[in-house]
Amino acid sequence: MYGTNLLETMGKPTAGHLGMAVTFTPKAYRELHEKYAAPFTNRALLQQQDILRVHVDKLITALRAKARNKESVNMGEWSPHTQPDTYTTFDIIGDICFAEPFGCLDGGESNEWARAIINIFKAATWDQAIRRVAGTGTLLHKALVKIIIPAEAAQWRTIHFSNSKAKTLARLADPDRQHPDLIKHILDSEDSRAALSPTEIILNMVLFISAGSETTANTMTGWTYFMLRHPEARARATAEVRAAFASPRDIKWETVRALPYLNATLEEALRLFSPAPSNQPRVVPACGAVVAGCPLPSGTTVSVAPWAAVFSARNFADPERFAPERWLDEGGADPRYAADRRGASQPFSTGPRGCMGKNLAYFELRLVLAHLLWHFDLEPTDSAAGRECMRRWEQTDMDTYQTWMKPDLWVDLKEAQR
C-alpha cells in the first residue's frame, strides 16, 4: 500500500504520449486497450496459428538435432548457443508484432536484441521506483534514470527501444503487406489508424516485445523444471499428449485446449512460478474503497504480492507442493484440493488491466509444451552441473526484477519411440 500522490507523479506523459504500462487514468487506458485488443482475441489467434506453427517446427528441428547428437540442452538462462524457450517466444512475438521474426531459431545463436530483453526488466524495476518519486518524463525522472539505473541495463534498454522504433516505423511504412500481425490490425482499423500516432504505437511495441517474449519463456522453463522434478506428472502428461494426437499436425489450438492434465500442469507451474512475480499496483478510485476492512482514500495504490497469495495455506492446501490435480475438475479432481481458492493465482493479473496478451501466452505455451512432450522424452541432465541447476531452481536464492532471473536448466532429450 502506498501514498495518495501516484496519479500526480506517475501520470504525466512523455512527449505528449503514454504507453499502456504507465497510463493511469481508466478512460485513457480503456481507449488504448480497445485500439490494441483485436489482435489478441481468440479469433485473431486462430488466424495466426500458422505463424506459431512455423516457429514451433523450427524449435523441434533444433531440439531433434541436439537429441540425435546426445547433446544436453539448456532450457534456462541465457546461453551463447542454446536458449530454445527464449528463442522461440522472441521469434514468435516479432512475427506477430512486425510481420517478421528476429531470426533467433534460424541462426541458433543469441543476437543482440535477444540478449537485451532480460536487461529491460532490470532497468524497468529501477525506473518504476524512480517514477514513484519523480513522475514520468520529468526532468527529475530523466536525471535519476541516468544516475541510478545500472549502465549496462540502461544500454540494453536503449538498444531495445531503438530496435523497436526502427521495426515499428518500417512496418508502418509497408501498409500493403498482407500478414496478420498486430500493426496490420491497426492499419486496417480506420479508428485505430486515426487515433494512434507513430509515437504511441512505438511506446506500446516496446512493451509488447519485452512482455510477450521473456515472461512466456520463463513459464516454459519453469514448467520444464517442475516436470523434471516430478517424473510421475511428466509421465502422465506425456501419455495424455501422445494418446490424443496421431501426428504433430493434429496439435492445434482447438485440440490442445482439451487436454485436462497438460493444462493442469501448466496452471500449477504458473501458480508456483508466476511469470510476473512482482506486485501489480491498482489505484483506489475517486469514491474511495474499503479493503480487508480498512478504509482507503482516493488515489491510494494497493497491490497483492503474488508469492504471498499462492503460497498461503488460506488459499491452497499444501501450497508448496506441485500438484496439478488441484486444477482438475469432474473425473480427475482430488478431494484434498477441493477447498482451494484457484482465483488466488492470477499470473496474468486480473480486472480491466489484466494482461491483454493472456490468450496469446496460453496459445504459445500449450502448443510448444504439447509438441515437446509428443516428440521427446525429457530427463534432467545427470551431471554435477545439471544437479546444481536443479538445486538453484528451488527458488530459495533466485533473483527477480519484475520477472525471474532464471538460472540454467540442463535437459537431456530422447526422441520418442513409436
Curated annotation (Swiss-Prot):
Family as reported in the entry's similarity comment: Belongs to the cytochrome P450 family.
Organism, as annotated: Pyricularia oryzae (strain Y34)
GO biological process, one term: abscisic acid biosynthetic process
InterPro entries: Cyt_P450, Cyt_P450_CS, Cyt_P450_E_grp-I, Cyt_P450_sf, Cytochrome_P450_monoxygenase
Protein name: Cytochrome P450 monooxygenase ABA2
Binding of heme, residues: C355
Pathway note: Hormone biosynthesis
PROSITE patterns given in the database record: CYTOCHROME_P450 (PS00086)
Function: Cytochrome P450 monooxygenase involved in the biosynthesis of abscisic acid (ABA), a phytohormone that acts antagonistically toward salicylic acid (SA), jasmonic acid (JA) and ethylene (ETH) signaling, to impede plant defense responses. During pathogen-host interaction, ABA plays a dual role in disease severity by increasing plant susceptibility and accelerating pathogenesis in the fungus itself.
